[in-house]
Regions:
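Catalytic phosphate/metal-binding cores of nucleic-acid and nucleotide-processing enzymes, i.e., regions
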Residues: 1-103
């Protein structure tokens, strides 16, 4: 299991314990048994969607550390949400995720 997956799991637990509803979003290209490519989601879709106890939507892109690459589509999505006063951000720890989701 890679570092990003471990961080993501810890974040999901912390958000759940804080009263958030958390959904792990899956996106990318997958291949069926017949080899056919299936694309789900869209470019820039964050890793986690949550609803905090106030009923506010929260979009979180999980990165293993602050040096990890941020794709232009990810940056654009997070910025678009913030422009609309929707809670969103890049996070590397449960503490950062709680800051975005609850503060």
């Amino acid at each position: 299991m890679n570092k990003e997956t471990l961080v993501q799991r810890k974040i999901m637990i912390a958000l759940s314990e804080a009263g958030c509803i958390v959904i792990r979003q899956q996106s990318g290209t997958f291949y069926g048994r017949d080899g056919q490519a299936v694309r789900i989601g869209f470019p820039g879709l964050p890793d986690l969607l949550a609803v905090n106890p106030k009923g506010e939507a929260v979009f979180l892109e999980v990165k293993p550390d602050h040096k990890a690459h941020r794709r232009p589509e990810q940056i654009a999505f997070i910025n678009k949400m913030k422009e609309r006063n929707i809670r969103a951000g890049f996070v590397t720890s449960p503490e950062e995720a709680l800051e975005v989701a609850l503060k």
